[in-house]
């Protein structure tokens, strides 16, 4: 991967004290590959160290998809989807990459799987009316391993959250707002503008006070949310075991072959 490829995978724009990061793979429904993780992760890190950036907005290019999750073609090529120098930042260089600056997801379309996990990792979420959210990994014999499997339970009533986890079914933006998963639902085509407007309300305040509020609210120590670390450890242990199962191989294979999976429970 060249530096130019990594740079093109996400567009960076400054709007006053707000940095806008746009995942720039509309032809692939903004699916995450290694280039996206590098571009997004590096942009976040620069924003965190820049005293003139007071908030960050993340969105997807185009008007169909915010992020379709992991790039299955990249996975089939055995491409590393994570930042090569900062694997600890997690999926998209984002989901385990805490920054002091407030983050806002402008969900301009479908946000299934990893797209929902990016939204869950954001402080605030603005979504277009046609947006949808969900964690469909169980339909492929997998699990929402970018933090979604435990964060969804923090964001929704438990019964609602586990229904989404167990069925893999999506919910609309309206339902996501009703349950408190997102902050605002706005007309299609206006999610980014609405997110920037929300960022403006945040950046109207004293930036250091906002950053302290964020760190204390999340219980951050040495750049990580301390209460989440045992859950990440448990998730990684469970995923390693799951990936050795026949079902974990059958799900992606059936998807690639466009047929119903045949589960064996082993």
Name these PLM-found stretches:
Residues 1-63:
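Conserved CoA-thioester-binding segment of acyl-CoA-metabolizing enzymes
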Residues 26, 126-131, 182-230, 246, ...:
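C-terminal long alpha-helix characteristic of the crotonase
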Residues 63-67, 112, 217:
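Short, active-site-adjacent cap segments at secondary-structure transitions
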Residues 92-100, 106, 112-166, 179, ...:
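CoA-thioester-processing core
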């Amino acid at each position: 991967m060249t530096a130019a490829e990594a740079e093109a995978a996400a567009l960076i724009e400054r709007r006053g004290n707000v940095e806008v990061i746009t995942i720039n793979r509309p032809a692939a429904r903004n699916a995450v590959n290694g280039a996206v993780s590098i571009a997004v992760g590096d942009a976040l890190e620069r924003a965190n160290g820049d005293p003139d950036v007071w908030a960050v907005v993340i969105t997807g290019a185009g008007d169909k998809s915010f992020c379709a999750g992991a790039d299955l073609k990249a996975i089939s090529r055995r491409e590393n989807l994570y930042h090569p120098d900062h694997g600890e930042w997690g999926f998209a260089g984002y989901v385990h990459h805490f920054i002091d600056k407030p983050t806002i997801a402008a969900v301009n379309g479908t946000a299934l799987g990893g797209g929902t996990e990016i939204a869950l990792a954001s402080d605030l979420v603005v979504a277009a009316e046609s947006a949808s959210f969900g964690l469909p990994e169980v339909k492929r014999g997998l699990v929402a391993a970018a933090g979604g499997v435990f964060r969804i339970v923090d964001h929704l009533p438990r019964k609602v959250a586990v229904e989404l986890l167990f069925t893999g079914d999506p919910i609309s933006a309206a339902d996501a707002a009703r349950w408190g998963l997102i902050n605002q639902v706005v007309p299609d085509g206006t999610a980014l503008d609405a997110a920037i407007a929300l960022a403006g309300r945040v950046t109207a305040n004293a930036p250091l006070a906002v950053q302290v509020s964020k760190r204390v609210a999340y219980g951050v120590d040495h750049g990580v949310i301390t209460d989440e670390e045992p859950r990440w450890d448990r998730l990684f242990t469970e995923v390693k075991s799951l990936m050795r199962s026949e079902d974990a191989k059958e799900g992606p294979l059936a998807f690639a072959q466009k047929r119903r999976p045949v589960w064996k429970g082993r």
